[in-house]
Amino acid sequence: MADNTPTTANDLLNDATQAAAKSPEEIAKENDLLPKLITHLDRHLIFPLLQFVGDQDDEPSPEITKAKFELLKKTNMTDYVASLHCEIEGVDEAPKEYANKRQEILQRLEIFGQESEKITDLLGREDVVTGLRSDKVANLEFLKKEHDVTIEMVNVLYDFGNFQYSCGNYGAAAELLYQFRVLSTDDDKVTAATWGKLACEILTGNWESAMEEVQKVKESIETKLFNKPLAQLHHRTWLIHWALFPFFNHEPARDVICDLFFSPAFINTIQTACPWILRYLTAAVITNRNRTRNTGQYQKQLKDIIRIVKQENYEYSDPVTDFIKALYLDFDFEEAQKKLSEAEEVLRSDFFLVAASENFVEAARHLISESYCKIHQRIDIKDLSARLGLNQDDGEKWIVNLIRDTRVDAKIDYKEGTVVMNHPPSSVYQQVIERTKGGFFRTQVLSAAVAK
């Protein structure tokens, strides 16, 4: 017999809550950006991302192994591709074609070595290098006259560098592409060599050199493509994705790339072509709270990211950007805590952000507490702890440290379990002055401009 008991509102609410609750794995899967990222990365740069996904599984994933095989089968990394083939097919020995291809690659390496030997030896000599100038045409003339160097010999450096890159010999490839770039006057090949060298520096973890190449690629986009806006948009989109590697792996790069992404041309590119990059820019701005000494710059970046998240919310959102929306646009502290919890799972499953997850959570808790304290005179420690995702004991310790570190004017009433904020009274006159100060300054500037 069917149960005819009527469904209550509480039953519906509980069912909805249970249905809405998602596991960490579901949250991570729903917010996986890998399909979007790989369309803007070279195949060699995609490999570390696949490796990261594979490392998260307890057992080797056949899907990841097949993806690696498909990714690298057209490269010269024959030995590794052969091992992947054996793993996929469950055999001990790879087909003979891999041994044949390996032999062909070794022969090509030997030929390239012979063809480039003269020019690489010359570029390794101090007396030759000191004779080079910034004028590439003059350099080629000098090398042709003094050492019988030809354009064909210079182009061999480019071809050899590409070949070494395909073999996975990134250090050797970087050196060859650098030498080619010093001498070549072929703009297209020089641009390609710069992208190639950037990839090499990323893959070898030479972050300072990678940042130099990021700047060179940026300059190339601005100068060589200045009259081709669509090409600029395309190249900037790719550079934004490649720059994520030093962005979160090299501390000194954080401020430089933040400034780059916030620049008008690049923030426009992000909003137009790749709004999912807002996850990384938002995470960088939030974590900058714990590392920057320039409070003014940090506040400006925070205001900018709030504005951009608001503009792009219809186009892109994830728990990281939703945290900003909940806290600064909706002023919903419960939703902010929920999104922070989800954002933590997203960061832990993101190749670029996994190392920043703890700093992000810590900085986000500071932002929640700062916003909460601004609008409350007396704060219940238990309530604030819950909003920060902490138990009462941990929350109390965290709040004590916050008051000590930020030197905020507040007292803890342990008996009542509350924090009493001492907000200095602000007169109506002072508020009017603060609000009109900026307008008065702008009026002065405009008046001066008109007077000229």
Swiss-Prot record:
Residues 246-426 form the PCI domain. Gene3D superfamilies: 1.25.40.570. This is Eukaryotic translation initiation factor 3 subunit E. It comes from the Eukaryota. SUPFAM superfamilies: Winged helix' DNA-binding domain. HAMAP family: eIF3e (MF_03004). It comes from Botryotinia fuckeliana (strain B05.10). One of its GO terms (biological process) is formation of cytoplasmic translation initiation complex. The gene is int6. Component of the eukaryotic translation initiation factor 3 (eIF-3) complex, which is involved in protein synthesis of a specialized repertoire of mRNAs and, together with other initiation factors, stimulates binding of mRNA and methionyl-tRNAi to the 40S ribosome. The eIF-3 complex specifically targets and initiates translation of a subset of mRNAs involved in cell proliferation. One of its GO terms (cellular component) is eukaryotic 48S preinitiation complex. Residues 1-17 have a biased composition (Polar residues). It is found in: Cytoplasm. Keywords: Cytoplasm, Initiation factor, Protein biosynthesis.
